[in-house]
From Swiss-Prot:
Species this chain originates from: Oryza sativa subsp. japonica
Name of the protein this chain belongs to: Vacuolar iron transporter 1
Gene Ontology biological-process annotations: intracellular iron ion homeostasis; intracellular manganese ion homeostasis
Ranges per topology, Vacuolar: 60-65, 192-196, 246-252
Description of how the protein assembles with itself and partners: Homodimer. The dimeric interaction is mediated by both the transmembrane domains (TMDs) and the cytoplasmic metal binding domain (MBD).
Amino acid sequence: MAAATDGGGLPLLADKAASHSHHHHPERHFTSGEVVRDVIMGVSDGLTVPFALAAGLSGASAPSSLVLTAGLAEVAAGAISMGLGGYLAAKSEADHYQREMKREQEEIIAVPDTEAAEIGEIMSQYGLEPHEYGPVVDGLRRNPQAWLDFMMRFELGLEKPDPKRAIQSALTIALSYVIGGLVPLLPYMFISTAQNAMLTSVGVTLVALLFFGYIKGRFTGNRPFLSAVQTAIIGALASAAAYGMAKAVQTR
C-alpha cells in the first residue's frame, strides 16, 4: 500500500509523529556494550576458576588455610592476566582502526571517484535510488572528514574507539575478576574444616552464578532464567571436574 504524500511527493509523517508523541513506546537499549562485555568476562571467569580450584584442593584434602592462600594467589594472578589481556585486545583494536583510517584516507585522496561510487553502493543496499543518494554523495565529497567517518563506519564497519578504552577495559576486567573470585573463597575465611567450607562455597557460588547469569541475560537480551541455569551449570561442571580429578589422583 502506497504511503500518502504531499504535493512534493514526500510521505506525510506529521500525523504519525503526533500520534507517536501521545503513544510513546519506550525503547530498551543498552549502549555500553563494551563495559558489559568486560564485566561479564571478568565476573564469569572470577566465579568459575577460583571455585574450581578451591573444589579441587578440597578434594585433595587440603586444609582451609591452604585452599584460601592458593585461591587468593590465583585471584591475584588471574586478575592481572585477564586485565592485561583486555588491555592488549583494546589496544590492538585501536591500532587496527588507525591503520584502516590511514588507508581509507589515502584512497579518498588518490581515487576520490571510486570512493564516491562506493558511497552509492552502500546507499543502494538500503533501497535508495541514485537520485536520492546523489545529494548525500555530493555533500560528503565537500566534507572530507565526514566522508572519512562515513566510510569507516559503513564500508568497513568500524567504530572509532575511545582513547581511554584500553585502560578502562583492563581495570574493569581485573576488578570484576577479583569481585567474582572472592565469592567462592569467602567460606574458607571463616570455616576451618575444608570439607564444610567447600560445601558452603558450593552453595554460595551456585547462588552467585544463578544471580549473575540472570543479570547477564537481562543485559545481553537473552532469556534471563535460561542464562542463569546455563551459567550455574558451567560453574558446577568445572568445580565437579576439578574435585573428581583431585580425588582420582589422591586414590592412585
